[in-house]
Amino acid sequence: MYEYFTKLKEPEITPLKAGFLFLLCAVWLLTGLIGHDPWKPDEAYSFGLIYHILQSHDWIVPTLVDEPYMDKPPLYYWTAAILAKLLAPILPLHDGARLATGLYTALTLLFIGLSGRELFGKNRGWAAVIALVGCLGMLIRAHEIITDNALLTGCTMMLYGYALSLRRPTLAGVILGIGIGIGFLSKGFIAPILFFFISAALLLFREWRTRAFITTLLIAIVCALPWLTIWPWLLFQRSPQLFVDWMWTHNLGRWFGFVKGGDYHEVFYYVKILPWLAWPALPLAAWAVWEARKKIWHEPEFQLLLVSFLVMLVTLSIVPDIKEVFALPMLLPIALLATASLSTLRRGAANALDWFGIMTFALLAIALWWGWGGLLLDNNAWITHQLKNAQPGYDPDFHAIPFGIAFFATMAWVVLVWRVGRSVRRSLINWATSVTLMWILLMTIWLPWLDTGKSYRHMIDDLKDNLPKKYNCIADVRIGDSQRAMLQYFGNLNPKRNASRTCDLLLVQGDRISKPIEDEIGWEKMWEGGRKGDANERFRLYRRVKE
């Protein structure tokens, strides 16, 4: 499938280089998976669903603090709960659960590498992986407790199944079907919808109207059926109402209502954010398309990647919820197209990208070290004051191990950017190495500062210290899903909704401006607090005043 590109010679990937690239990807992947609390907003509520499985052993109905949460199927939550349970003797539950993200991201890197190898030749597997690792949109999201990482794995397997279909249709069908199933059990109907439209669009091209491709599609459907039916059937057996709530209220019904309403004011959202989300792969992908423009619609590899990207872009742009994290699947065809550019990219352009990356990340590294040192030494620099204002509750302290890791990584980066051989691939490798350095610095010397602002642990500890020794129950007012999940995890507190008439305590979430609560008569405020890094989000505890 890569006839056009095999005509161009390029250096082989030696075992030593392959080992270095594997180490780079492993460091990028593993950094940040452990060592910090669940962060607001997405990690907090996602872990709340996982924590319910661990506490109740209910594997069928996703539940958040005793209330069904039917937004997504539970595959990611199952995986995270299993890992959290297995690793509980050595890791906190939330760290063990986050390793599910590491597992799915590792599978994503594996299948994007196999896709690059299948589409563009044996030397392109590592290039595809490095291109994806370097995308700025992957850095934080690929290390969070979110179901989107499992969806990304499913989409990557689907792309590999398509790429393999013209050569090994049976195996391709199995992989494609499993990818559809993983995507469905992670985020719902988006993966089957992508499969339908990508397959239909590819059949418009003569190169894909073959018996092998039809065989692949049929096998994929058969292999996907168990994934698409077993959990929904079990859910229906448990509760027909919850099944309807999941399938219609939170998924199909919302989409049909959105389409009927015609509110498309954010339809170009992904077009606007992709330039930074997919940087630097996007300009490389654009160059590959431009360079091969005369043959682009006659080469199966370009047909697959362009069709996949366009289908993802259109499909994800006409859904009720538009968020940056939902664009992650679009990074896959972009990274693979960027891989194709390495044969034709001009050396001057590669050098420009290389030096831009080195200078940018060198300045960022200096700023991170300078800011950390300023906080530790408590100097009077402007940046130190800004950092203190951003996290007013942060108490800086020196920790030898994180400092040693950060210092070693910085020195290693300086050596590597000067020692990487002169080639077009150098710009991608240096960029990915630089992104990894930034992530290491953030997850070592800067982690306590970040955790102070994103964790609810200290706020909930303070709340518990101010609770009366005896009380009946706590009612909640306007407490969000993420906050309720963390109240249960850190404080073993389960505030009840719509229970202000029966409970003797009332917990209210609001802003920093003290506003009267509903029917404030009969209540007395006994505590107020919030996360140290957020002066706007406040929690107030009231107790009922006996008349």
What are the language-model segments listed below?
Residues 2-351, 531-538:
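Membrane-integral, polyisoprenol-dependent glycosyltransferases
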Residues 2-10, 15, 172-174, 178, ...:
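Membrane-embedded architecture of ER/inner-membrane glycosylation machinery
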